[in-house]
């Protein structure tokens, strides 16, 4: 038995989320686990985290256990023949037998895409959030700086039973001029995130960018952990899971 780390890219538009669910809902985990026996693997895949319906991923890590002797370099091609068009394996490697995709992650990173132009884009309607009005990027960057470090982020999250304290290692804004127009990209990196935290932060930052609230208003949200003080949850389709990092010793068989 070998344990493999798979990196999966997916378009979340037609998925009911990452995590396997009942009632016949289509999920990323469900589709991957359905394909695994086709390469001689056990039908169980453990992800680095979970994404909601409509959220995309560039390289979501999963660990799986393989009983067959299939060479690891052939795993992506073999699995991709069995997977749907909106879910593909883009990398595979053998890892330590006790490697755990969720528990061993040192950090995880997300990106949120915002298209800023006068008219919506049919091509990016499932890939980026459209905003008609120009954004005050300087104010957004000031607000982003307040989020860095260790705080109670419950004020940005969905209903949570877990403690809200998390450490945000990196929070930055990038601007790109793409074919569709000006794109603002928000990047967040931390060891772990609360459910809905990233989209809650984005929704609040958008209010800052649109002049609906001052940057310093985020201080009260972090201090009180009151969700009512934050902005709305940003739509799922602009969010991407980018990557996760692991200790080198866990990545060696």
Curated annotation (Swiss-Prot):
Q: What is the lineage of its organism?
A: Bacteria, Thermotogati, Deinococcota, Deinococci, Thermales
Which family is annotated? Answer: Belongs to the tRNA pseudouridine synthase TruA family.
Q: Which organism is it from?
A: Thermus thermophilus (strain ATCC 27634 / DSM 579 / HB8)
Alphabetically sorted, this entry's keywords are: Isomerase, tRNA processing
- Residues annotated as catalytic: 52
Q: What is this protein called?
A: tRNA pseudouridine synthase A
Cross-referenced CDD domains: PseudoU_synth_EcTruA
Check the record and name the InterPro entries matching this protein.
PsdUridine_synth_cat_dom_sf, PsdUridine_synth_TruA, PsdUridine_synth_TruA_a/b_dom, PsdUridine_synth_TruA_C, TruA/RsuA/RluB/E/F_N
User: Which Pfam family would be a valid example here?
Assistant: PseudoU_synth_1
Describe, as the record does, how this protein assembles with itself and its partners: Homodimer.
Q: Which domain of life is it from?
A: Bacteria
Binding of substrate, residues: 110
Q: What class of enzyme is it?
A: isomerase
Catalytic activity, per the record? uridine(38/39/40) in tRNA = pseudouridine(38/39/40) in tRNA
